[in-house]
């Protein structure tokens, strides 16, 4: 038996485990850590700071080679070969010590095209007796939605907040996507769909009142919008900036919604960029990285081939700008894979 120490952002918890068990499976009987598919989606990513382990069946998209070298692991794919010390990116109160219901039935309330390649889907959780009830989640989390009559599921982040009582999703349409086809040809108001979740560890962290900078491209706006809406409902006084971008102007969406949100939140600034555009009408020409560079007055290296150097450069920039730009004192990122 090995001693496994899971350290949260504000404490730690221990559990002994047999070598044949991954951490997520062993923990299920007593506690629920943040996880989703149990098969390598990267929701349960953590840092191993000490000990020997074996990572089994991990996709390179979930843990790239450079991250694996740095000690990144997926708890659902990590099998200990010695005592381990693991760091998770959330606080102790995110761990549940009782069973959590993760399967739900929901009804489609709206399914509307909001740009050339984006659909707004609104769901309402329901019970068999048609009583509508809310589904509790943390802004930034996601659920899996199943196409009726199939076993095909896709993961999408909520753009709404739990207090609204509805689940709003901003979904990109892909040419050969199964869920994209469902949205365009089959989805109807009143139709019921199965949900699984919520899941995910990408959410707002305590930042001590410092300013926040949110960066979102395309439908990556969805979880960010949920977070900002939550800040608005809480009347959070901290300065916040949203940098949002798309490739072409016809792909723009929620411009009016963002403008209204900024008007209702005096501490929120919104900037929008379009790559293939001359700018104007409240839109800048360029990428969200261009907006971020202007916001922080630093240079970033781009390109997949330079990922390691980019990360090292960004880390150096954070060190150089900690005093001048509080937003760089901590950063949180969630990678999104195309999901049609």
UniProtKB/Swiss-Prot annotation:
According to the record, cofactor stoichiometry and binding are noted as: Binds 1 [2Fe-2S] cluster.
Q: Locate the residues binding FAD.
A: 215-229
Signal sequence region: none
- Positions binding [2Fe-2S] cluster in this chain are 37, 41, 44, 76
Q: Which InterPro entries match?
A: 2Fe-2S_ferredoxin-like_sf, 2Fe-2S_ferredoxin-type, Beta-grasp_dom_sf, Cbr1-like_FAD-bd_dom, FAD-bd_FR_type, Flavoprot_Pyr_Nucl_cyt_Rdtase, FNR_nucleotide-bd, MRET
MF terms from GO for this chain are: 2 iron, 2 sulfur cluster binding; metal ion binding; methane monooxygenase [NAD(P)H] activity
Any one GO BP annotation for this protein: one-carbon metabolic process
The protein's required cofactors: [2Fe-2S] cluster
Residue limits of the 2Fe-2S ferredoxin-type domain? 1-92
As recorded in UniProt, its EC number(s) are 1.14.13.25
Catalyzed reactions per annotation: methane + NADH + O2 + H(+) = methanol + NAD(+) + H2O; methane + NADPH + O2 + H(+) = methanol + NADP(+) + H2O
Q: How does it assemble?
A: The soluble methane monooxygenase (sMMO) consists of four components A/MMOH (composed of alpha/MmoX, beta/MmoY and gamma/MmoZ), B/MMOB (MmoB), C/MMOR (MmoC) and D/MMOD (MmoD).
Name of the molecule in the record: Methane monooxygenase component C
What gene name is given for the protein in this entry? mmoC
